[in-house]
Amino acid sequence: MGQRMTAPAPDAVVIAIDGGGSKTDVLLVDASGAILGRTRGPGASPQVVGLNEGLDVFEQLVVDAAKQAGLPGRPPYGTHTAAYLAGADLPAEEEELVAALTERGWSPSIVVGNDTFAMLRAGTTDGVGVAVVCGAGINCVGVAADGRVHRFPALGKISGDWGGGFQLGSEALWWAVRAGDGRGPSTDLLPAIVAHFAAKDIFEVVERLHFENLPREAIHELCPLLFEVARAGDVVAQGVVKQLVDEIGTMVGTTIRKLEMAGEAPTIVLGGGVMTGVSRDVIDVIEQQCVEVAPRAEVRVVDIAPVVGAALLGLDAIGASTTAKTRLRTSAVGSVASGVVGQHPDGLVDGGAPGDPDGVGERAESFGAS
């Protein structure tokens, strides 16, 4: 029999952080699952803005949340910190962040992980399964029932990745430019992008990007436009969407095989702005590819704030009850969460999470190795 987990102290407080590329969300949650404070701030990935600068942003948000809760705005801010961050892609990065947060005295225990784990926990009752987050970038992680973990470095093209909103926007622009100068086939992406930026032609768009009259981030805006043009039947746009679908299917299939889950009924969680914005037919094709590898797989598109998953992982870590986790989900709906697309038989839409075990166990991580 497994070791029985000690119940958390009634005054235990979890500091949950979801640090994405565009925003940072913080929740303070007590051992009963009640939300004590919540704050949102700018994206401040330590890998982008620097370690101390990023942690300064996180800490101010934690202080603000603590003040909302009527707690002292000085460390320690809580019992346990669960920080799940975009850019925490390698063990060395996670260890550096844990050491820095420990030095700041945020809480007696601290866990740092990639934000894809928070999405997996938000979209499942037990943190077991496979998650793909496709937002600005793309990442995939898997956790087996025995705690084994498979993940990819997710460092972009240098680590073999393809996908994410910026990549898709770049592809849309690339095809539009080539249609404009004659090097590529005709595509409705060309007039759509010109109209989007209110330009006289596609070359004005290129010049504005080159001279930074348009910020580089504007390329990300083309991602929804790409899907619109594809839905209207444009062959070029459909080809880009197919490449994304195939990439997601490959990431999920590889993870399922590495974790030997093909004979099981794994939950596949799809999240991030790109996934929650696509049409059902795109999800259907992804689902078809997933069930080819694991016939009993269930694919879910989850539009829940990943910080809720971070908080659930924090409650797992302190040994909180199933009731506490259900309470958190219920409290989050309509305030932190923004709903779920698709069928969710375990009741994640209304906050119910029946049968929620106490956690996913010790994680033996692998990078492309079984």
Could you say what each language-model-derived stretch is?
Residues 84, 113, 267-271:
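Solvent-exposed beta-strand sheet faces enriched in polar/charged residues
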Residues 2-78, 102-103, 122-128, 174-370:
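ATP-binding/phosphotransfer module of carbohydrate and carboxylate kinases, centering on a glycine-rich
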Residues 86, 90, 165, 275, ...:
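Short beta->alpha junction loops/turns
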Residues 88-191, 325, 330, 337, ...:
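Phosphate-binding/catalytic loop of phosphoryl-transfer enzymes
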Residues 78-87:
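Conserved beta-ketoacyl condensing-enzyme motif
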